[in-house]
Swiss-Prot record:
Gene3D superfamilies: Transferase(Phosphotransferase) domain 1. The gene is Gm7168. ATP binds at L34, G35, H36, G37, T38, Y39, A40, K41, V42, K57. PROSITE patterns: PROTEIN_KINASE_ATP, PROTEIN_KINASE_DOM, PROTEIN_KINASE_ST, UBA. Disulfide bonds: none annotated. This is Sperm motility kinase Y. It comes from Mus musculus. The lineage of its organism: Eukaryota, Metazoa, Chordata, Craniata, Vertebrata. It holds the Pfam family UBA_SIK3. Residues 1-22 are annotated as: Disordered.
Length: 508
């Protein structure tokens, strides 16, 4: 990176090095840099209230990339789909713009296929269906991506995908043609090389055909380092037929990579193709109008408890402000959804009977936020590591909640299963557990436990054990409790086995 860029966008630190970063650091803890370009930088950060990791794109407003990035943000504000990366928050200062994005786990589809050689037809179908669902959703909103390629598709170890990078996307009305020619050459449709107006939805469908071919073969159908030669191949529309695949798949590939866009199918027609027929249940209905936002009352109550106003929360959501309140709401909503999914997958754990008096001081809930007159939803957390690192914003939140504890206050307890930095890709952190803790203090719990232990010793006509013995019991209690909590809330995901390394050689 050039030296002057490093000066303008300094490396992350626990405290803001620029006064304009105050708003960012008041809501997020900046961890480290994920990547950088000439005029922008992407940071890994954690949301102070929930502990959820996010990606922060920092842009310089006086640079050429700023306006395209804001255009991308305006398009992403209209999108909410499980197979598309989510935009959480947007704000600007005098010289910078900040895009808070969902942190996507996994690796690029390009790297996934490259490491495997190719993937089998059934797996390719499952991945392609997710891509098709996202593209059909966008086309239903009048949004064309224009840069669909394996590099812009992320896949995790469960086979779930998310489309990223809407930097070249645009919104059109039905029947509108585009004049701007952009995207990767190898995935560009023939009409892009003719330098004429084109239908953006049809060019997206061509790119889908190239992606599908790449998945089952392991290489792109049109390949040349010489641009004129690559252009000649694409305009001719002739490519090596894939080996070892069904006739239905071959037919779908030929339809998607039809040179004349007038005869190229739409997303709706692709879904009806025999290769996909019977597998499209559950895909997003592209003709369905967006459902009006109805905030979850449990989440609204929790946010009210820490000082937000219900009216402001609803206004932020309905008017799509993408501000601090809407970001907090969406992060809590995603945690609740993940918790529900994991609870359905987790096996039933029988209760463990301890040989010592049990504590009645609160029960952890993994599904819903419970609130009562004496309950506090600010639970203890293992992150952040020190109360001194909390910004004034978080401390004010705790004061509004009426909590004067020396412990760290997050809305949910963060999971300790943190990925190491030497992994090949950044995984999205495990969602924290939702807690409903009692207002009984730790001192009163400790006093009751010692009192109960004293009664047991007197009943057996034995002297009371030393404090060291009591502390050992307390440590044992905490270990058992942590083990039970881990079983209930932290079921790790299973990794899919590695695919074979054999490659399919295209027919000449």
């Amino acid at each position: 990176m050039p030296a002057h860029i490093e000066e303008e966008l300094p490396p992350p630190s626990p405290q803001p090095s620029n006064p304009e970063d105050g708003e960012l650091y008041s809501q997020y803890k900046v961890v480290r840099t994920l990547g950088h370009g000439t005029y922008a930088k992407v940071l890994l950060a954690k949301h102070w209230l929930t502990g959820t990791p996010v990606a922060v794109k920092v842009l310089l407003k006086n640079k050429p990339c700023f306006q395209p990035a804001m255009k991308e943000a305006n398009i992403m504000k209209k999108i909410k789909h499980p197979n598309i990366v989510s935009l959480l928050q947007v704000f600007e200062t005098k010289t910078r713009g900040y895009l808070i994005m969902e942190l996507v786990e996994g690796q690029e589809l390009y790297e996934y296929i490259k490491s495997s050689g190719h993937i089998e037809e059934d797996e390719a179908r499952q991945i392609f269906l997710q891509i098709l669902s996202a593209v059909s959703y966008c086309h239903g909103l009048g949004i064309v991506h224009r840069d669909l390629k394996p590099d812009n598709i992320m896949i995790d170890d469960k086979g779930s995908i998310k489309i990223i990078d809407f930097g070249l996307s645009t919104q059109v009305k039905p029947g509108d043609l585009l004049d701007e020619h952009c995207g990767a050459y190898a995935f560009g449709a023939p009409e892009l090389f003719l330098w004429k107006s084109y239908d953006g939805t049809k060019s997206d469908l061509w790119a889908l055909g190239v992606i599908l071919y790449y998945m089952v073969v392991g290489k792109v159908p049109f390949d040349s380092y010489i641009i004129p030669e690559l252009q000649r191949q694409i305009l001719a529309g002739v490519y090596p037929a894939p080996c070892g695949v069904s006739n239905e798949l071959k037919d779908l590939l030929s339809l998607l990579m039809t040179v004349n866009p007038k005869y190229r199918p739409t997303v709706t027609e692709v879904m009806k193709h025999p290769w996909l027929r019977g597998h499209c249940k559950g895909l997003t209905n592209i003709h369905e109008e967006p459902v009006p936002v109805r905030p979850d009352p449990d989440i609204v109550d929790a946010m009210q408890y820490i000082g937000f106003q219900a009216k402001d929360i609803r206004e932020s959501l309905t008017k799509e402000k993408f501000n601090e309140m809407s970001a907090a709401y969406y992060l809590l909503e995603e945690q609740a959804l993940q918790r529900e999914v994991r609870s359905t997958q987790a096996p039933t754990v029988s209760q463990v009977k301890a040989p010592f008096p049990s504590m009645d001081a609160g029960e952890a809930s993994c599904l819903k936020i419970k609130r009562s007159g004496s309950a506090s939803i600010l639970g203890r957390s293992v992150w952040p590591p020190s109360i001194d690192q909390e910004p004034a914003y978080v401390q004010k939140v705790r004061q509004r909640a009426g909590r004067r504890s020396s412990g760290h206050g997050l809305l949910f307890e963060a999971n300790q299963m943190t990925p190491t930095q030497d992994q090949h890709h950044i995984r999205a952190m495990s969602v924290p557990c939702m807690l409903s803790t009692s207002s009984i203090s730790e001192e009163s719990v400790s006093e009751k436990r010692e009192e109960n232990l004293s009664h047991i010793a007197l009943a057996e006509d034995k002297p009371i054990r030393s404090r060291g013995w009591c502390r050992g019991i307390m440590r044992w209690t905490r270990r058992v409790g942590n083990a039970i909590r881990t079983l209930c809330c932290c079921i790790p995901s299973r990794k899919t086995p590695q695919l074979g390394q054999s490659r399919v050689s295209p027919q000449k």
